[in-house]
Amino acid sequence: MKRYILPALALSLLASSCKLDLTPENAITYSNAFSTEAELNTTTSTIHFYLDNCMDAFSPLTKIGLLADETQDDGQLREGNPRTIIQAAADWEYVYRMIFEANLLLDNIGKTQGLSEDRYAYHVGQAHFALGFGYFMLSRAYGQAVITANAKDLKLYGLSTQQQVIDAGIEHALKAFELLPTYDKLRTTSGNLATYKQYGSKGNSATLLAHLYAWKGSMAELYGDTSVDANAAYRKSVEYASKVINGETGAYSLVSTPDQLCQLLSDPNASNPEEIFSLVYDKSRGNESTSKNEVANLFATWPVNSTLTQGDLAQAAFRLKKSTIEKLYPDADDARRTAFFYEFDTDHEVSGVNYAVPYKFRNAVFTVDQSAESGKSFLSINANYVYWRLADVYLLRAECSAKLGDTSGATSDLNRIRSRAGATAYPAAGESDLKKAIFHEREREFILENDSRYYDILRNGYHRTELTGKFPSLTAADIAGGALCLPIPSSAQRDKDGKVINGLILQRPYWFRYM
C-alpha cells in the first residue's frame, strides 16, 4: 500500500491525533502515485476500505438509541452517563482517514494519464460520495467537526458548526449525484459492473441528500437556528427522496413480504431490489472478520447462534421482551411480528422473563473451536450491513411531508410500508398524531437492523420521551453544549502523551465539565 506525507492536515486530527499512518517521503511520491488508472485505483479502493470500516466512530450513539429492554454491559451508556460515554472512547479516526484519501484523490487525479471521461467521473464521484457520507455522519454524531479544504495545505483547523458540516456534506453529495450513474451502470476499479451496492451511485447519492436535508431542517428546529429555513430543507429532502422512489436514480422496489426481506437480508450474496447502500461483509479479510452490522450482532442469540440454547436468551448483549414487541406491533396481523421474531406466538421464558427472539438475520458464521462442546464458536451474523433500503426513503419522505403539512402525502407513504406488512392503515384505532405514527413505523421497520433510531429520535425532538437516564432532564444549555452528541475525541486535541497538538479544537462545554 502506498504511503504519503500527510501535509499536516495539521488537523492534528489527521496526523498525530487521528494517527494516520500516511507519510510520503517526498513530493515525487505524489506525482508517481497517480500517473496511471491502476495507481489511482489504489486510492479509490482505500477510500472504500475506510468507508466500510468507519462505523465504530458512532457506536455509543447506536447503542443508546436502540429499542431494547435489557443489555448485558451497556446500561450506564444507555442512561447517558457522561463518564461512561467518555470512557467508550469513540474516535473519528477512520472517518478522517477516508476524508483524507478522498481529498488526496481530488487533489491529484489531474495527474492520471489516459483517463476517459467515464472513468474520471467514477473516481471523482466515489471521492465526493465518501466526503458527503463522512460529513453527514460526523454532523449527526459529533455535531461540530473539522472540514478540511484538501489533502495538501499545511495548517491547523478548528471545529466548524453543525450546519456548516451538513452543508459540506450536501456540497459533496450533490457533486456525487451529478457525476455518478445509476447502480446498474456502475463500473468499479476493475472495470466490471458492480456486484455489491457498497459503491457511490446516483441512487445512494440521492438517498444521502434526502437524509442530509432532513437532518439540516431538523437540527435547525432542535437548536432554534433561525438562520436556516427548515421547511426549505424538508422540501429538498422530499425532492431527492422522490427521485429515488420514482425510479429516476435506479430501479429500486419494495420486496413482497417481511419474510422475504429477512431472507434477503440474511444472504450477503443475494440481489435485494430494496437495497440502496450497504457495507459489505468481507469474510476474506481473515478468520476473525465480522459483519459491519453491529446492531444485528448485538441482538444475535439462539437459535441463529446454534451453539446456544433457549436458556441462553438472557445472556444476549441486547434483549427485548415479548410484551415490548406486542406493544410495538399492536396489530396482530402485522407480518413483521412473526418474520422478525422467531416463533413469536410461542413463549420463550427464561428466569421468569418472556423474551422476543430476534430472527431478522437468520444465518451465522462460526469458527472452528476444538475446546467448545459443539466444536465451533459463534463469530458473526452472516450479513452485509444494508444501511439504506427503499422503505427508509419512503418513511423519511413521509416524515418530511408531515412536517411540511402534507398530510395526504405523508399518510400515503406511511401506508405503503404498512400495506407490505399487512398492517392496518393509518389512522388505526387510537392514532391521531401522524408524526409520531411515522416515527413508530420506522421503529417497527428497522428494529434489530440499523443505527437509525437515535437519529430518528433527534430529528423528531423526542429525546426527552424516548431516551432514559439523564436525557429527559437535559437543560437547553446542556443540549446547546453538545449533550446529544459525542464528545470531541481527545486525539483531535492531544497526542498519545497528552501534549496539545491543536489548540484550535476545544471540547464541547457539556463534556468539558466531566473531563
Positions of predicted regions on the chain:
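Conserved, well-structured interaction surfaces
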Residues: 34-49, 74-145, 153-167, 171-188, ...
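Short, surface-exposed recognition loops and adjoining beta-strand edges that mediate ligand/DNA contacts
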Residues: 57-66, 182-204, 218-299, 424-437
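Bacterial Sec-dependent N-terminal signal peptides
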Residues: 1-38, 169, 210, 398, ...
